[in-house]
Design a protein with these regions (language model features):
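Gram-negative outer-membrane beta-barrel transporters
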Residues: 349-350, 419, 522-529, 547-643, ...
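Surface-exposed extracellular loop regions of Gram-negative outer-membrane beta-barrel proteins
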Residues: 252-267, 372-379, 427-438, 447, ...
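Transmembrane beta-barrel wall of Gram-negative outer-membrane proteins
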Residues: 177, 184-213, 218-256, 281-303, ...
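N-terminal Sec signal peptide and the immediately downstream disordered periplasmic leader
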Residues: 1-74, 78-82, 234-235, 716
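Face-selective signature of the C-terminal outer-membrane beta-barrel domain
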Residues: 239-247, 284-437, 462, 519-525, ...
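Short acidic/polar hinge/loop motifs at secondary-structure boundaries
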Residues: 116-117, 124-150
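Conserved C-terminal beta-signal and adjacent last beta-strands/turns
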Residues: 14-15, 197, 235, 247, ...
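Membrane-embedded beta-barrel scaffold of Gram-negative outer-membrane proteins
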Residues: 293-295, 303-321, 462, 468-474, ...
């Protein structure tokens, strides 16, 4: 084939990758990060072996530090990952709850925290063994990159891996460097940051701290948060290194405005339900963790990596459960106090070599994680005084642990073909010891064991150096979390050990292209079929119970394109279409116990709530190293059902943001400043939803037009 014809073929593939899905997304269509220039040597590690995303048979995106920090508040991860296709990240404007994250529909049902998606910060799991996670302890001011892995290969991370999000701190600078930043804006938002980095006498260090506070967009939504993060790196003369990571989070008080009903959302989106004020709904969190990573190269072909970590997290949450509802002897109260001790290890061996003259990479390892959680419940009143800690109503020690051996390999079969395969054997154990045995509230101790074998295989074909095709298939599983096990149906006490894990079969087909003229593009088609999906059974009195209910299907298309022109002009487009439905019908209820007459049938074919069928993202940025810079971005999100019965949904929304700034040098200092506007068209929309909220308060409003002004200064000695 002559060069002209080959070039024409490549251009047709690239343009087809963009145009065909764009037509399919005319109704609703989500995003990927603005990265470095096309053909830049970008490397990711989400598959446990360093490789370029272009050479991996999986959907994977890398968000760099410039995207994370340029013109941003650096408060929530949702600011940075909005451009990743298949990933829906929502800022709930409620710091008593974590950012709402779902990947290809996994995690969408979570009413608080993050579930269905595995989270890691500097290699340390931010997801507990039960599958429940949080990511509020990330200091974005010292973050180097975020990697997002979607599709079948996520299962190699074990339980609850509908997707994998990994956050990595900066590596130590070669010269001592200090950095200071401040940003402030609408609704009393203020963020202060400081960082020191350098290398001296064989020790590399990055030490950072940030403080954030806000009055909140809505009434009763003020919050304050302080994060500290330190990364220390020691090298030795034998090809090894030790990295110590220390992280702390302090959230002394975050008011919880709760959700709003459709009527409340329409009349006063900044308002709050009266019950939030009556009971002073709020949350506080205190967390400290430390991890150690030991990397040792044995020889040219073999390396070992050992991770050890431990941490402690205290959480206290005051809810708005009415006094009368807590009258029953089996009710656990309206205050939840959790004291969590967690620890774990991951030992990994990597071998690189050649077989039949073809290169291969083999990774084998063993992961163990454990959580001990003391769950105590209290009444949220004393006499006629509401919103205070009252009488003890629950006291138990819950433990969850996993023990997972895993192995994966990539073999280059020829100059064009490569095959990647892996397997993980996941064992998850739950135990509960009841310490509150009073009257008719008997001993509710119990245990459960879950296990699954999770195979994955993928193949990649290099059509030429600019176009790669791939296909991947795998199996995943998702156990119930401790929060989903916490309450038994029909008012019974004890954990709901009748719940079983959901099991999924995943398939993905994709094409990746890169061109110096046309930029980088990806297109992925995927389908996930799940059996024994965990869904809501009842939701009443501030408590949700769950059940296994038949089958679901998640089918969709993701497309992304990015390019850099004239070195500094960066353009990006990302699209997602996701059809997530229940394949089987089931019953749900808004009262406990749930008599048959009160049950509502969720019809087969209903959409899974919390998931937009389509979303689209586009951005254009002028980003020279020094001088004036600016960017504009737009995001369109389709309607989002709020419950399993699909009785209501958020309206479609289009949100536009823009920022302009300047970067310069002055007497050895690098100085920068910016101003940013979000929702500059002042659209009214729901930024997130509380799925299956029992009182009909589904809607969490997003702010109107907001402004942010920020500046930073750094100096390298």
């Amino acid at each position: 084939m002559d060069k002209r014809r080959c070039s024409t073929t490549r251009r047709a593939v690239v343009i087809g990758t963009l145009v065909l899905p764009a037509a399919a997304f005319a109704q609703d269509a989500a995003p990927r990060p603005a990265g470095a220039a096309s053909l830049a040597p970008v490397v990711v590690t989400a598959t446990r072996a360093e490789a370029a995303p272009f050479d991996i048979p999986a959907s994977i995106d890398r968000i760099g530090s410039e995207t994370i920090r340029d013109g941003r508040a650096q408060v929530n991860i949702s600011e940075s990952v909005g451009g990743v296709p298949g990933l829906l990240a929502r800022d709930r404007q409620n710091y008593a709850q974590d950012v709402q994250i779902s990947v290809r529909g996994f995690g969408a049902r979570s009413t608080f925290g993050i579930r269905g998606v595995r989270l890691y910060v500097d290699g340390i799991p931010a997801t507990f063994p039960d599958g429940q996670g949080q990511i509020s302890n990330v200091d974005l001011g010292s973050t180097d990159r975020i990697e997002v892995l979607r599709g079948p290969f996520s299962a190699l991370y074990g339980n609850s891996s509908g997707g994998v999000i990994q956050v990595f701190s900066e590596e130590p600078a070669t010269r001592p460097t200090v950095d200071f930043s401040i940003a402030g804006g609408s609704d009393g938002v203020v963020r202060l940051g400081a960082k020191a980095s350098g290398t001296a006498a064989g020790l590399g260090y990055v030490v950072a701290a940030s403080h954030f506070r806000t009055d909140g967009y809505r009434d009763h939504s003020a919050a304050e948060r302080t994060i500290g993060n330190a990364k220390l790196k020691f090298g030795n003369d034998t090809g090894g290194s030790i990295t110590v990571i220390v992280n702390s989070l302090n959230l002394p008080r975050a008011q919880d405005p709760l959700g709003l009903t459709r009527a409340q959302f329409g009349s006063d989106p900044r308002g709050v339900d009266a019950s939030a004020l009556q009971f002073d709904t709020r949350k506080n969190v205190d967390q400290t963790q430390v991890g150690l990573i030991y990397d040792q190269r044995i020889d040219a072909a073999n390396a070992l990596r050992l991770l050890i970590y431990t941490g402690h997290r205290n959480t206290t949450q005051f809810q708005s459960i009415p006094v009368a509802t807590q009258a029953g002897p089996l009710h656990p109260g309206g205050v939840i106090a959790l004291s969590s001790d967690y620890r774990g290890t991951d030992l990994r061996w990597t071998n690189r070599g050649r077989v039949a003259e073809q290169p291969y990479t083999l990774v084998a390892g063993l992961a163990y994680d454990t959580l001990e959680q003391r769950r105590v419940g209290y009444q949220n009143f004393v006499g006629t005084t509401l919103g205070v800690q009252g009488a003890l109503r629950r006291d138990e020690l819950d433990t969850a642990s996993d023990f997972d051996p895993y192995a994966q390999a990539t073999v280059q079969l020829s100059t064009r073909w490569s095959v990647s395969a892996g397997v993980r054997r996941s064992h998850v154990r739950f135990d509960s010891v009841d310490h509150y045995i009073v009257g008719t509230n008997g001993n509710d101790s119990g245990s459960a064991r879950y296990a699954a074998t999770l195979p994955v295989i993928g193949a990649l074909f290099a059509l030429d150096e600019h176009v790669h095709l791939y296909a991947t298939a795998g199996r995943g599983f998702e156990t119930p979390t401790l929060n989903e096990l916490a309450y038994s149906p029909n008012g019974a006490t004890g954990l709901n050990f009748a719940l079983r894990p959901a099991k999924s079969d995943n398939l993905e087909l994709g094409v990746k292209t890169r061109s110096a003229d046309l930029g980088d593009a990806t297109l992925a088609l995927f389908e996930t079929r799940t059996q024994q999906e965990i869904v809501t059974l009842t939701n009443a009195g501030g408590r949700s119970t769950f059940q296994n209910a038949g089958a679901t299907r998640r089918r969709g298309v993701e497309a992304a394109w990015s390019a850099t022109y004239a070195q500094n002009l960066r353009a990006q487009i990302a699209l997602t279409y996701l059809d997530a439905i229940y394949r089987d019908s089931f019953l749900t209820c808004n009262i406990t116990p749930c008599p048959a007459a009160s049950a509502q049938r969720v019809a087969a074919g209903n959409r899974i709530p919390g998931v937009a069928r389509g979303s689209a993202y586009a951005s254009l940025a002028w980003a020279p190293v020094f001088g004036w810079r600016g960017a504009v971005d737009a995001r369109r999100t389709g309607m989002v059902p709020v419950n399993d019965t699909n009785s209501d949904a958020t309206p479609r929304s289009i949100v536009v943001g823009a920022n302009v700034g300047y970067v310069g040098r002055f007497d050895g200092w690098q100085l920068s400043g910016f101003v940013r506007g979000d929702n500059v068209l002042a659209k009214r929309y729901a930024g997130s939803v509380i799925v299956n909220e029992g009182n009909g308060r589904f809607f969490e409003p997003a702010p109107g037009r907001t402004w942010l002004l920020g500046t930073s200064a750094s100096y390298a000695f």
